Regions:
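Acidic, proline/glycine-enriched N-terminal capping motif
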Residues: 1-123
Length: 123
């Protein structure tokens, strides 16, 4: 399943964020709302999430062509992106026990969710 949503990592929340919202917190809350609005779903196990991070507008066309589909090896961390997505979808994400996350460069932000079939069938 492909969702045209720009991935946002889960920020470190502070007590002050309850009454004074910082920009990263507001971005994350908007991301959660968009995920719920578009009906994003993820299985409890055997999933592969690909986070497509949009390339900066300042990059040249040559650099964009070189980097499209290549691994994104900068911040945000893939675990914070995955944590943000799981918290947006599930009230209690403790039921999720197996999954994989990848982040790559792309023209626009996307979240691609695939099932990994038969991986744990023999266990």
């Amino acid at each position: 399943m492909i969702y045209n949503i720009t991935p946002v990592p889960k920020p470190r929340m502070t007590q002050r964020d309850r009454w004074s919202k910082r920009k990263p917190v507001l971005n994350y809350l908007a991301f959660k709302d968009e995920c719920r609005l578009k009906g994003v779903t993820i299985p409890e196990c055997n999933y592969h999430v690909i986070f497509v991070i949009p390339m900066p507008k300042s990059w040249s066309n040559k650099q964009r062509a070189e980097m499209k589909g290549k691994p994104h090896q900068q911040r945000p961390d893939k675990d914070n992106l995955e944590k943000g997505l799981l918290d947006a979808i599930f009230d209690e994400d403790c039921q999720v026990w197996d999954g994989r996350a990848t982040k790559i460069w792309g023209e626009t932000g996307q979240i691609i969710i695939n099932d990994i079939e038969g991986l744990h069938a023999s266990r």
